[in-house]
């Protein structure tokens, strides 16, 4: 045992011993655990610590498995027990017995025997029970078997000099009254929510809320279980942390704010170990872990661990190092209660007339505009997806409740499409479009009745007929894009002239997003294949064979012209978009995010200022939904915020490629290299899609069915016939 400088003994402090026990799990410094360790359990055979009358006691403490002293401490009546060493090799199974110390005075605890105090000037003892006597030498405390139910009174401390016995008794009575008041304050403090630190919430077996089972102090926190409960259930693992100091009564700080000079120790999160923000679902937890637990329970998530459930959730690790399966398992084992989670409330709610006018874009276009009702078999991508019939379209951008903002930014693949989330709405529209493609491009009759498979499992076919392929790309796909917009409830309030401007911008952008993505997912980057939405691919390694077998006979171009026209565009798309998609390994949800960003672009050329503000508000909500999606679904990544930025930066490359794609389309149309189609021409020419006040097309427009009808309530209150098309300014031939 290392040498210790013995402090000078002074006046004895009255004291009593409270014995409890706890189980420590890891190394903890003595000073941070407690200021009073009085004895060891019966499993130890080394010397124990005791309180003697004005005599310093030096002892050591060893575990039951090893006789090597691991703790050295000294006791003086002046300052109580002060540790001079540290725990260097504390085993997990070591049980310690603690005494409660408040400041510089040992206070009595419930169920503890009284130890009278004395000094060199004390009076001789009398027969009265309340008389101050010299403290006898105490034997080492016996092992804890049971705790008495009533505490013995604490005798007054210090030297009392009286001549008259009555005065002495009166003085002793005053001391006892002060001690009782002090005990009441102590009990109020140790059972206050501010000092207990809610350790009972961390215990898997609930402790009875009575004095002899649990105790805290203003400077240190101790936890204990009685022997009867120990025999019926294993002892809990308690975290020994410093209790919060109570603010002074004279403090002018607000409730819940520590006074100046108060030191408040923040309890650790029971899941990851970082600083907690309070009690969440029954345990001390940080905001991130509590939000994760709430999302998992509300969305009924089912995670799996790639390491067999052996991951470690630590506070110093980044979000990407937290396995969601192990993190949720630790939430449950720490005591988080699923029943405490409040599930989502009504997502629609009711708004006042003022809020409706503020949110509704119709107030800017047409005050009397009516809102149509969309009736569609809305689906989800999962096998359990149902239908949502007769969903009323909102009059404007709905306010998404905060409870939904933290949960709806997930993939939304297993929930209904009736929820108010911009990202969720886009995902539902993309899922419905995928099912429509299954019907149009099915290779056999059985495919009409099958659920759409994943992209990797789709069967590709090589180009055999250019005319059939162009029919798919320039007759079916533009109509699917229009249906994608028409079914989007967030765009329903817009007048038809504004929808057409958005559509002409979106239909080209959409092709520039999907084709590089499909090419990458089907391995086209390595094979130099160009994959189209109709599951047809062109092999750019051998374009000549398509001229030899007559697949491109309807193109009216020779081999050299075709190569010079399309090969640079393909190479540019794969280098600037496809390779970046491959590098980030983007998901189908992120593909939908890109489609939403190009659809809700407030910078579209020629749109009305009211439309621009309207699109900006929807896009801002989409960005918020995307942020929540990355916080939840992409939390396993090392830097999800960087990935989110990389996805957003793809929009610039998509816009550049869409310009090249538009130029190719104009060239094919102007030189009559593809079969004529009225809707295809209207899609590229603004003059052919402008709407006159009476609802008819302009006289110079080509004849043919309009891709969308013009309802009376959706025309808007202004005309903008002079606006050029969004692509005309870039592709003027």
From Swiss-Prot:
GO biological process: negative regulation of transcription by RNA polymerase II
Location (main, coarse): nucleus
MF terms in GO: DNA-binding transcription repressor activity, RNA polymerase II-specific; RNA polymerase II cis-regulatory region sequence-specific DNA binding; RNA polymerase II transcription regulatory region sequence-specific DNA binding; zinc ion binding
Region ranges (AF-2): 676-687
Domain of life where this protein originates: Eukaryota
Cellular location(s): Nucleus
Family: Belongs to the nuclear hormone receptor family.
Protein's name according to its UniProt entry: Nuclear hormone receptor family member nhr-66
Species assigned in the record: Caenorhabditis elegans
């Amino acid at each position: 045992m290392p040498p210790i400088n013995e402090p000078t003994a002074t006046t004895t402090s009255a004291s009593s011993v409270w014995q409890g026990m706890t189980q420590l799990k890891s190394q903890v410094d003595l000073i941070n655990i407690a200021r009073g360790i009085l004895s060891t359990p019966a499993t130890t055979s080394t010397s124990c610590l005791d309180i003697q009358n004005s005599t310093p006691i030096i002892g050591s403490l060893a575990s039951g498995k090893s006789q090597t002293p691991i703790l050295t401490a000294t006791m003086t009546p002046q300052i109580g027990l002060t540790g001079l060493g540290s725990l260097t090799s504390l085993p997990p199974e070591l049980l310690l017995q603690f005494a409660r110390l408040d400041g510089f005075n040992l206070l009595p605890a419930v169920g503890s025997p009284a130890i009278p105090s004395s000094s060199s000037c004390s009076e001789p003892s009398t027969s009265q029970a309340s008389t101050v006597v010299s403290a006898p030498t105490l034997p080492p405390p016996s092992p804890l078997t049971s705790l008495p139910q009533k505490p013995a009174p604490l005798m007054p401390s210090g030297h009392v000099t009286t001549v008259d016995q009555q005065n002495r008794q009166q003085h002793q009575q005053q001391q006892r009254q002060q001690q009782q008041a002090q005990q009441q304050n102590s009990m109020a403090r140790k059972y206050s929510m501010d000092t207990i630190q809610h350790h009972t919430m961390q215990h898997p077996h609930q402790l009875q809320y009575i004095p002899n089972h649990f105790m805290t102090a203003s400077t240190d926190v101790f936890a204990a279980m009685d022997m009867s409960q120990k025999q019926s259930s294993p002892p809990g693992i308690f975290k020994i942390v410093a209790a919060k100091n109570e603010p002074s009564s004279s403090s002018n700080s607000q409730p819940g704010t520590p006074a100046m000079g108060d030191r408040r120790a923040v309890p650790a999160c029971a899941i990851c170990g970082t600083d907690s923000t309070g009690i969440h679902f029954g345990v001390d937890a940080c905001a991130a872990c509590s939000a994760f637990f709430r999302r998992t329970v509300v969305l009924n998530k089912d995670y799996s661990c790639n390491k067999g459930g052996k991951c470690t959730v630590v506070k110093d690790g980044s979000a990407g190092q937290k396995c969601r399966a192990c993190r949720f398992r630790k939430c449950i084992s720490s005591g988080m209660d699923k029943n405490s989670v409040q599930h989502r409330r009504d997502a629609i709610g009711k708004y006042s007339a003022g809020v409706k006018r503020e949110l509704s874009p119709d107030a800017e276009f047409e005050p009397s505009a009516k809102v149509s009702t969309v009736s569609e078999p809305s689906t989800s991508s999962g096998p359990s997806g149902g239908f949502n019939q007769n969903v009323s379209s909102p009059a404007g951008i709905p306010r998404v409740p905060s409870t939904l903002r933290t949960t709806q930014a997930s993939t939304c693949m297993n929930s209904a499409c009736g929820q108010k989330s911009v990202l969720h709405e886009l995902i539902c529209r993309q899922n419905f479009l995928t099912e429509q493609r299954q019907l149009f491009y099915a290779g056999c009759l059985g495919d009409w009745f099958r659920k759409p498979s994943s992209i990797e499992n789709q069967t590709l076919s090589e180009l055999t007929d250019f005319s059939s392929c162009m029919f798919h790309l320039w007759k079916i796909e533009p109509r699917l894009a229009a249906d994608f917009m028409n079914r989007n409830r967030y765009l329903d309030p817009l007048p038809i002239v504004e929808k057409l401007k958005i559509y002409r911008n979106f239909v080209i952008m959409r092709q520039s997003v999907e084709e590089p993505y499909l090419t990458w997912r089907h391995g086209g980057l390595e094979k130099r294949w160009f994959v189209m939405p109709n599951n047809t691919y062109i092999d750019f390694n051998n374009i000549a064979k398509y001229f030899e077998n007559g697949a491109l006979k309807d193109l009216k171009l020779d081999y050299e012209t075709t190569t010079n026209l399309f090969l640079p565009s393909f190479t540019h798309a794969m280098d600037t978009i496809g390779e970046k998609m491959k590098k980030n390994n983007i998901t189908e949800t992120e593909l939908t995010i890109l489609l939403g960003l190009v659809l809700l672009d407030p910078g579209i050329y020629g749109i009305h200022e009211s439309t621009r503000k309207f699109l900006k508000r929807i896009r801002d909500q989409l960005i918020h939904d995307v942020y929540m999606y990355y916080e939840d679904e992409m939390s396993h990544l090392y830097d999800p915020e960087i990935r989110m930025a990389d996805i957003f930066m793809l929009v610039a490359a998509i816009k550049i490629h869409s310009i090249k794609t538009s130029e190719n389309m104009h060239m094919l149309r102007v030189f009559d290299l593809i079969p004529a189609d009225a809707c295809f021409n209207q899609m590229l020419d603004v003059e052919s899609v402008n709407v006159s006040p009476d609802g008819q097309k302009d006289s110079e427009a080509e004849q043919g069915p309009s891709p969308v009808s013009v309802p009376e309530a959706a025309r808007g209150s202004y005309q903008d016939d002079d606006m050029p098309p969004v692509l005309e300014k870039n592709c003027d031939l």
